[in-house]
Amino acid sequence: MSDHHGPLRVGIGGPVGSGKTALMDLLCKSMRERYDIAAITNDIYTKWDAEFLVRSGSLTPDRIAGVETGGCPHTAIREDASMNLAAVAEMRSKFPGLDLVLIESGGDNLAATFSPELADITIYVIDVAAGDKIPSKGGPGITRSDLLVINKIDLAPYVGASLEKMDTDAKRMRGARPFVMTNLKKSEGLDRIIGFIEEKGGLTPRRSA
């Protein structure tokens, strides 16, 4: 997919605190040896997430861009994605061989989605700490994302959440669309997410890890 229209673009959305930035960090560090990668983050009035990725050493700083969306962060990934598209274009001009661009949305609700013009694949991250009813509430992120990530499964016993209920509800709401349960703090489930991106996106490693 990265050959005929530029790099594969993966949009990562989800509520504040669900683990979007942690997933961005892990994907960059796990895939950068095999693929040419850039990362773009969205924040309302700051570039905190981009700065976190720089401090973490996810990628070299010139491969990380922060977009300050202002106002409503949903608009910058959906109705008017021009700022993000410009950031992608700038990365492509700096790194013509890009295979993959990861785009993290600003903190958004269950109704936020990525424009097909901006993201080829969408991943939506929710977390167990928000309650086991989240999958049953639906919304485009839950029902229509290409991959749903149910993160922080290690917290289930502490917040009284049933992983079985979340599993059942996710299957009911998503039908044939896949989901994965993760503990990104320990990289549990990360391999499945990477495998999904590679298979769905048609990525071919340029070099061995």
UniProtKB/Swiss-Prot annotation:
Lineage in the entry?
Bacteria, Pseudomonadati, Pseudomonadota, Alphaproteobacteria, Hyphomicrobiales
Question: How does this polypeptide assemble, per the annotation?
Answer: Homodimer. UreD, UreF and UreG form a complex that acts as a GTP-hydrolysis-dependent molecular chaperone, activating the urease apoprotein by helping to assemble the nickel containing metallocenter of UreC. The UreE protein probably delivers the nickel.
Q: Does the keyword rRNA-binding apply?
A: no
Which keywords accompany this UniProt record?
Answer: Chaperone, Cytoplasm, GTP-binding, Nickel insertion, Nucleotide-binding
User: What is the documented function of this protein?
Assistant: Facilitates the functional incorporation of the urease nickel metallocenter. This process requires GTP hydrolysis, probably effectuated by UreG.
**UniProt subcellular location:** Cytoplasm
Disulfide-bonded cysteines: none
Q: What is this protein called?
A: Urease accessory protein UreG
- InterPro entries (UniProt xref): CobW/HypB/UreG_nucleotide-bd (IPR003495), P-loop_NTPase (IPR027417), UreG (IPR004400)
Q: Does the keyword Chaperone apply?
A: yes
Q: Which family does it belong to?
A: Belongs to the SIMIBI class G3E GTPase family. UreG subfamily.
Example GO BP:
urea catabolic process
Instruction: Report the Gene3D superfamilies cross-referenced here.
Output: P-loop containing nucleotide triphosphate hydrolases
Binding positions for GTP? G14, P15, V16, G17, S18, G19, K20, T21
Q: Which GO terms describe its molecular function?
A: GTP binding; GTPase activity; nickel cation binding
- What SUPFAM superfamilies does the database record attribute to this sequence? P-loop containing nucleoside triphosphate hydrolases
**GO CC term (a single one):** cytoplasm
